[in-house]
Regions:
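Structural alpha/beta surface segment adjacent to cysteine/selenocysteine redox centers
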Residues: 38, 42-142, 254-341, 421, ...
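Short boundary motifs at domain starts and secondary-structure transition points
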Residues: 20-27, 230-238
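An acidic- and aromatic-residue-enriched active-site/binding cleft used to recognize and process polar
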Residues: 66-69, 194, 247, 277, ...
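A broadly tuned preference for mixed-charge, low-complexity surface segments
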Residues: 86-94, 231-241, 296-297, 372-375
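Residue-level preference for long, well-ordered alpha-helices that form the structural scaffold
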Residues: 81-84, 88, 160, 249, ...
């Protein structure tokens, strides 16, 4: 690592973190836009929120611009198109259950014919404003609820009685779109995962005329779904296990590891297993995102020194040199030193200081690159689009998810498992009671 980076990173990161948090006022000249794809399941979920959002937008942002693309962007993280589509269907089903979106029990990708019919309906309709958004929601419902008969009827009417319309707030493009997103003030917000952040921003700038009520079952950081002592004991007795696959040069890895260790592991009696991954250039990250996550989770952050490939390798070496039963605490200390104390573990003096703090008289002779490559392979087998990858095992079931946007699933899964357990027990009790009544 260069001397400039080692010296300047801690200073710059501390300044960035401590600078006044007054939000810049984002420009409104371009209004608010939403980018959708008819064959994108996240767009289906997003479309269900648009009529309500339009209703509370100030006149300054009306009408909401709807940009519909017919081109999918390349799948992330080297996933195949089929893997990505299946991941999206599974993930959207989880989101729909959590936030009570409309969703089919057995979702399927819409057919090419249905997509073509839907596009004609939306291009030809004379409806505008909120009326168009309700039609858009209905069309998405027909596509994703497999209501192809209704869609054909609407298509026939649109083809015979309407002509192609041209409205500035309704645009059809072939610009690649991976998943639905909003654009405001030259910033992008995920269509579902960032909707609350977007509405907070709009409310802050006094661009909403009413209180936004979206994602009512959203689980906030440091908010526990389970607080009843009896229910908590039941989860703890199930001995949940959580695997984390993390990139050591990524600050999100530190923030989520610290959050899970400090806030969830002891509370729910979760056994953690950590799998460091080989360096993948994630030290080039969004400083603003990491800072926001730190402040929302309450996890310490900065001054840091972004690890390069050699520093990440040395972090893994230290981790592997510690006895297995001490490795969770050891990696916590290693990442804490890098991300809150500004240590550069590619620098000999810093490395030796960390080695001494961990009480290591000698280092592991293990092939670290081979160890990391094996972790990489197991991580890739999970077919997830982003890092960190998490796998939760509980009550004989395994649940795989990823990234800071899905940490809430840990609490949600616990709650769902308990709910299902109580349903089964209640059904068994009713059956027993009915049998006894029949005998009597």
């Amino acid at each position: 690592m260069s001397l400039l980076r080692r010296w300047f990173d801690p200073i710059r990161s501390r300044w960035f973190y401590d600078k006044p948090s007054r939000q810049a006022v984002l420009p409104t000249e371009q209004g608010l836009s939403v980018y959708l794809r008819l064959d994108d399941v996240y767009s289906y979920l997003t479309a269900q929120q648009l009529p309500q959002l339009e209703e509370i937008l100030s006149d300054e942002l009306k009408p909401l611009k709807v940009i519909i693309s017919n081109t999918a962007a390349e799948a992330p993280n080297h996933m195949s198109e089929a893997e990505w589509k299946q991941y999206c269907l599974n993930d959207a089903q989880i989101l729909a259950k959590q936030h009570r979106f409309s969703f089919h029990e057995s979702p399927e990708q819409p057919t090419a014919e249905a997509l073509q019919q839907a596009e004609v309906i939306l291009k030809n309709t004379p409806l505008r404003g909120q009326d168009f958004l309700y039609l858009l929601e209905d069309v998405f419902n027909m596509l994703w609820q497999q209501q192809y008969g209704k869609l054909r009827t609407l298509y026939a009417m649109a083809s015979r009685h309407h002509r192609l319309q041209h409205f500035p707030e309704r645009i059809f493009r072939d610009t690649p779109v991976l998943a639905s997103y909003f654009e405001f003030g030259e910033r992008q917000y995920h269509g579902v995962d960032d909707l609350l952040r977007l509405t907070r921003r709009l409310k802050q700038q006094k661009l909403l005329t009413g209180n936004p009520i979206f994602m009512i079952n959203h689980i906030e950081w440091r908010e526990h779904l389970i607080s009843d002592a009896e229910e908590l004991n039941e989860i703890q007795a199930m001995d949940p296990e959580l695997d984390l696959y993390i990139a050591l040069e990524d600050p999100i890895s530190w923030l989520l590891l610290a959050y899970i260790k400090e806030e969830l592991a002891d509370y729910y009696n979760i056994s953690l297993n950590l799998y460091p991954l080989s360096y993948r250039s994630r030290d080039d990250f969004d400083w603003g995102l990491a800072t926001r996550l730190s402040k929302r989770t309450g996890v310490a952050f900065t001054p840091f020194c972004r690890p390069d490939a050699q520093a990440a390798q040395n972090m893994a070496l230290l981790y592997c040199s510690v006895p297995e039963e001490q490795r969770i605490d050891a990696l916590y200390k290693i990442m804490q030193a890098v991300w809150t104390k500004g240590l550069d573990l590619s620098y000999k003096a810093h490395f030796q200081a960390m080695q001494q703090e961990l009480g290591l008289s000698e280092l592991s002779q293990q092939d670290i690159q081979a160890y990391l490559a094996e972790n990489d392979m197991h991580c890739e087998m999970k077919s997830q689009p982003n890092l960190p990858v998490l796998e939760l095992r509980l009550d004989g079931q395994s649940y795989v998810f990823n990234s800071l946007y899905r940490v809430w699933m840990i609490e949600s899964i616990f709650s769902n498992v308990l709910e299902e357990k109580y349903k089964v027990e209640s059904a068994a009790e009713n059956e027993l009671r009915n049998n006894e009544e029949r005998k009597g």
